């Protein structure tokens, strides 16, 4: 998967096209990611002891990983991802600026 938890990404297709956010969770087996503030759905919850009121809340739903692209840390634009071996470790590199995406 070309993106990881904590990456700044932009949605490149779908109803939330153009929105930016941080990846909250990644689901590699399903090829989906959870992006902050994107693909909001209404969740209905029954009253419980923890939440006696119950009601409707908004929360993020996962979107397919092909619909997001990481933002270049140098320019802030979307970029493709390349891979390079540095100090014996495989790191992700922004194709536009050549800057390393992994911390």
From Swiss-Prot:
Gene Ontology cellular-component terms listed: cytosolic large ribosomal subunit; nucleoid
The organism's place on the tree of life at top rank: Bacteria
Designated name of the protein: Large ribosomal subunit protein uL24
Recorded GO MF terms: DNA binding; rRNA binding; structural constituent of ribosome
Subunit structure, interactors included: Part of the 50S ribosomal subunit.
Gene Ontology biological process: translation
Organism of origin: Bacillus subtilis (strain 168)
Classification via PANTHER family: MITOCHONDRIAL RIBOSOMAL PROTEIN L24
Annotated Pfam families: KOW, ribosomal_L24
UniProt keyword terms in alphabetical order: Cytoplasm, DNA-binding, Ribonucleoprotein, Ribosomal protein, RNA-binding, rRNA-binding
Record localization: Cytoplasm; Cytoplasm, Nucleoid
SUPFAM superfamilies per record: Translation proteins SH3-like domain
CDD domains the record matches: KOW_RPL26
Disulfide bonds: none
Protein family per UniProt: Belongs to the universal ribosomal protein uL24 family.
Predominant subcellular localization, coarse grouping: cytoplasm
Described function: One of two assembly initiator proteins, it binds directly to the 5'-end of the 23S rRNA, where it nucleates assembly of the 50S subunit.
């Amino acid at each position: 998967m070309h993106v990881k938890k904590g990456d700044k990404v932009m949605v490149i297709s779908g109803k939330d096209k153009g929105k930016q956010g941080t990846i909250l969770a990644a689901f590699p087996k399903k090829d989906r990611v959870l992006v902050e503030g994107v693909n909001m759905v209404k969740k209905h919850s029954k009253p419980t002891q923890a939440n006696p009121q119950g009601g409707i809340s908004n929360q993020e739903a996962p979107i397919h990983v092909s619909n997001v692209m990481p933002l270049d840390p140098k320019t802030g634009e979307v970029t493709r991802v390349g891979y390079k071996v540095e100090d014996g470790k495989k790191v992700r590199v922004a194709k536009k600026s050549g800057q390393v995406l992994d911390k």
